[in-house]
Design a protein with these regions (language model features):
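Short acidic N-proximal helix/loop "leader" segments that mark the beginning
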Residues: 1-20, 24, 28
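Small-aliphatic-rich amphipathic alpha-helix that forms the alpha element of a beta-alpha
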Residues: 29-33, 114-120, 127-174
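Short, basic and Ser/Thr-rich N-terminal targeting/leader segments
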Residues: 41-44, 108-110, 183
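Short proline/glycine-enriched turn/loop segments at secondary-structure junctions
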Residues: 173-180, 198-200
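C-terminal helix-cap and adjacent tail motif
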Residues: 5-13, 85, 183-222
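Glycine/small-residue-rich phosphate/adenosyl-binding loop
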Residues: 49-139
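Glycine-rich phosphate/pyrophosphate-binding beta-alpha loops
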Residues: 35-41
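Short catalytic-loop micro-motif centered on adjacent basic/acidic residues
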Residues: 15-16, 46, 158-162
């Protein structure tokens, strides 16, 4: 596929046909995705390929509490799991909220699941002392995760970068024998999408880019 077409049509695929993602195709996807950049080219990214139905079912079970909170906050008009605005949703509200299947089923309905982790010993977390949640570490892992989806799209497959499993990181680490210095960055289900979307809804450049400062004039061309 042409690069811009791939970028504009790679979406969060959660419904799959059941077609197999062979090891050969998966290897090709990862072989190309590995060229993503990382801080200092230290390449702290690691991947565990999961086909075992029992382990995939366990992932789906482990994300349920995070999915319930995500859904309850969304229904309350809050930004789910945001670290800025304190939630008004009670633990009772969260417990009473059923997790939507779209947040749990992809782990078992996809053909394969990738557990993407990053070695925090080699990541430059330059924002670690700021009074906010850290985001900089992601610069050394999420380009790789996105490359996986771009390569999957090129091969006719799709998936989505899910992060709910991070809320159960100790359990995920135990399930896959992951050392504690590795952070669970994403769990990516992969399969052939039931429907390939071609027109994605995204903000126009003028609504997300400004000139010179945050509240500057919108960036655009005549």
């Amino acid at each position: 596929m042409e690069l811009y077409d791939t970028m504009r049509t790679t979406f969060a695929a959660r419904d799959y046909t059941g077609d197999a993602v062979s090891d050969a195709v998966l290897y090709k996807i990862l072989e190309n995705a590995r060229f993503a950049p990382s801080g200092g080219n230290r390449q702290g990214n690691r991947v565990t390929v999961v086909r075992d139905p029992a382990k995939r079912k366990r992932i789906a079970e482990l994300v349920v509490p995070a999915a319930k909170r995500y859904t309850a906050q969304g229904k309350a008009g809050e930004g789910p799991w945001n670290s800025i605005s304190p939630t008004m949703v009670t633990p009772e509200d969260i417990e009473a909220t059923p997790p939507p299947s779209r947040l749990t089923e992809p782990y078992t309905s996809s053909d394969v699941v990738l557990v993407v982790i990053v070695d925090l010993k080699v990541v430059a977390s330059t924002d670690q002392h700021l009074d906010r949640v850290g985001v900089i570490s992601g610069a050394s892992i999420y380009p790789f995760a996105w490359n996986i989806l771009l390569a999957a799209r090129h091969e006719g497959f799709g998936g989505t970068i899910t992060t709910l499993a991070a809320a159960a990181e100790p359990e995920i680490q135990a399930l896959f024998n992951i050392p504690t210095e590795f952070a669970v960055a994403a769990v990516i289900p992969l399969g052939r999408p039931v429907k390939q979307l071609t027109k994605l809804k995204r903000l126009p450049v003028e609504e997300m880019v400004t000139r010179e400062q945050f509240d500057g004039e919108p960036f655009g061309i005549n």
